[in-house]
């Protein structure tokens, strides 16, 4: 379903902090006051020019520096293609290495996001290489809709591991990704169990209360302490459930994206939530009729 840009913007305002780092700081500070952590992300991906990748690298370092100076409870998320992976693998790895090295200097953390499946191998290789030098300052993301995910967990050596586990949002062929929501959910819990077996720290990224319930059963099964895991949610999604999780004493982190390149991100959120897209369209048309 094609969604016109004005409607995407109308809907997407609730999912992004704004267009500037100042906006991300403001939103993060508000979350911190509610005992909620944040991970800040500069929107943008699929960079094809080295100067643009270097710009994003410097902006990521600026985000980390600002987090440190402002005393925020937040870390950084970034995408490998934003760092130049489409241009050159080693160039992108060097950019990420520089960011993670800076994060180590200020005792912070960088999450290497997972993009569509053609980048999965390189993303995991980046994580494996960076983990050797910065074991406590870098993590990556695994997606339960990918058939390969349990084997990817097995491929990582024991030791300090840090994952975000989510369902996945990119449109992938059936031979690569499960299409049945039930199987995706089952693979989510199966993968989470494997991660806990390896004593990994996991950001359990879901708004599905059934998955949260099953995750809590695994947390109890393994006798995990509150500092051994966290839940993660998107900005602007099911704040009632978010507050329930926090009030129960669990750590929770909200994804706080900002930047000029909000369109692609907002479109993905709409495609992931077609019912919300229809609701946003109705609201938009209602406002148009009454203005």
Task: Spell out what each predicted region is.
Residues 1-291:
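Positively charged, amphipathic and often flexible ligand-engagement surfaces
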